């Protein structure tokens, strides 16, 4: 995108509304992300198109799936309440996976397969009979980790291509999971928890990735200087034993994050959102320090609010989906400055979910979780591309 990140130092706010701090050089990795051809954005949003989406000049939208209706060229009825998603390369095409934030037995994950020209060639389920699958995370070994957002929620490792059965991963803990990001260099996973007093978790596997069968689950402890340390959870699966203490209460010093949402790994940084205070955070893995990149309270009016799913654009901007707010997908540059990428109109009781770019960076997928009928939860999944 033309709004690519620069090397200007950006300002962020301390953990508890402290003084403004200059971010060190290690955080400037945000400004060195690779550029992709084709998906560049410039200019204000135009009037809504036929699908009710306001886009910048030069872009178009199409509907690829609607809840309760069969996806083109398949027998799969698209699930209700589409939520977190990701794209995976497949031959000269790709697969877009999407969680279903429905309750048992309707939760799970669906997938749409596209050919190299973006035509839909199939759709199918890759996980079913689960509960409240909210977001998740793609792995470098091409699986999708789907997170249950319930008190005893688990993480399931799924195959986007529909060839292998899903596997439950208890070692990642039982709690109100939201999303997960994989640090492929350090060999660790980072997980968010959607509770008003939730934690940021880190999982270190006992064996090298991609083995997730066993390991150590820890919570972040942040000091007054925004330095991060980690303390182990004594029992990551409290709902399976006589121990009733939930994971977020097992370490007294654990730092509370107010409603953890989307999370993303990018070149040594962990980027995540917290919805109850409308913040975007950046954790520097090497330095083990954490900063606030965006705080809605510092913007009047707040262009970005209701922060939720997070991804990174081909040009390196952080892309944040709004749960409510103005029903926008919003870009953040290295200064934390927000710019709307698109806006969905006529669906004020919904939320935007699952933003993901195709492997070539030419197309963007996302959903309006409840569409125009919030009661029936008839979600709509869209594709954005150039004219």
Tell what function each PLM region has:
Residues 3, 10-387:
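Sequence/structural signature of beta-propeller domains
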């Amino acid at each position: 995108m033309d709004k690519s990140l620069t090397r200007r130092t950006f300002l962020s706010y301390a953990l508890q509304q402290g003084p403004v701090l200059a971010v060190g050089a290690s955080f400037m990795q945000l400004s060195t992300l690779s550029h992709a051809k084709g998906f560049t954005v410039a200019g204000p949003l135009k009037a809504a198109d036929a699908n009710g989406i306001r886009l910048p000049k030069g872009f178009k939208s199409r509907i690829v799936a609607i809840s309760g209706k069969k996806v083109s060229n398949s027998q799969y009825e698209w699930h209700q309440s589409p939520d977190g998603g990701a794209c995976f390369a497949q031959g000269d095409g790709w697969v877009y996976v999407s969680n279903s934030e429905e309750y048992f037995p309707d939760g799970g994950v669906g997938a749409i397969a596209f050919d190299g020209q973006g035509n839909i060639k199939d759709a199918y389920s890759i996980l079913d009979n689960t509960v409240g699958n909210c977001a998740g995370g793609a792995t470098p070994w091409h699986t999708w980790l789907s997170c249950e957002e319930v008190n005893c929620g688990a993480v399931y490792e799924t195959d986007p291509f529909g060839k292998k059965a899903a596997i439950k991963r208890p070692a990642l803990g039982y709690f109100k999971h939201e999303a997960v990001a994989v640090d492929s260099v350090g060999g660790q996973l980072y997980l968010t928890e959607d509770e008003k007093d939730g934690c940021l978790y880190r999982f270190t596997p006992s064996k090298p990735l991609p083995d997730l069968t066993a390991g150590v689950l820890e919570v972040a402890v942040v000091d007054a200087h925004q330095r991060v340390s980690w303390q182990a959870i004594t029992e990551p699966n409290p709902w399976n034993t006589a121990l009733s203490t939930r994971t977020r209460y097992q370490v007294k010093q654990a730092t509370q994050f107010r409603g953890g949402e989307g999370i993303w790994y990018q070149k040594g940084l962990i980027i995540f959102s917290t919805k109850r205070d409308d913040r975007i955070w950046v954790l520097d893995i090497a330095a083990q320090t954490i900063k606030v990149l965006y705080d809605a309270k510092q913007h009047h009016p707040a262009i970005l609010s209701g922060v939720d799913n997070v991804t990174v654009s081909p040009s390196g901007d952080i892309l944040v989906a709004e749960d409510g707010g103005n029903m926008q997908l919003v870009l953040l540059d290295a200064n934390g400055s927000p710019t709307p990428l698109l806006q969905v109109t006529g669906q004020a009781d919904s939320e935007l979910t699952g933003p993901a770019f195709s492997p070539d960076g030419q197309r963007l997928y996302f959903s309006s979780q409840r569409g125009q009928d919030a009661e029936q939860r008839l979600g709509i999944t869209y594709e954005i591309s150039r004219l």
